[in-house]
Amino acid sequence: MSGIPVDLKLEVVVLPVSDVDRSKRFYESLGWRVDADFPGVDGFRVVQMTPPGSPCSIHFGKKVTTAAPGSIKNLYLVVSDIEAARRDLAGRGADVSEAFHFEAFGGPRVPGPEPSGRSYGTYASFSDPDGNSWLLQEIKTRLPG
């Protein structure tokens, strides 16, 4: 074993959906790239899509997961400008929340951006047609590390 860990890059997150074609249309409308749409045996089908600028993709389909449709909550999408991201997604048909921040870690949501404007503090949210939920997190400057 060396002192340097191997690269472990998150590639795919699986989303449980009830209607594959509806989900594909929804994510396409948001500008996500269709990487694959493969049928398999016995009704299996997997769709892979990737958000603009992301190295990580999503999978959904038929017989892809046993999780209940809509059961995935708070997947993070990092953006550099929360208001620009909100406008873009809303213009593409997503029902995006107003910007909000948290009173404290684990605390309740508070309307409006994080008062100091610091990175990692301002959010907005939206859900897909099944209720899988996404958080937009504004990061202007990444913390070191």
Regions found by a protein language model. Give the residues of each.
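Residue-level recognition of conserved beta-strand positions in structured domain cores
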Residues: P51, F60-K62, E138
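Helix-adjacent hinge/juxtasegments
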Residues: K62-A85
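Core segments of cupin and vicinal oxygen chelate
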Residues: P5-L8, V14-C56, A84, G91
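Residue-level signature for short turns and capping positions that connect secondary-structure elements
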Residues: S54, K63-T65, T141
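Short beta-strand segments
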Residues: C56-I58, W134
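Vicinal oxygen chelate
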Residues: M1-V6, V12, D37-F38, R45-V47, ...
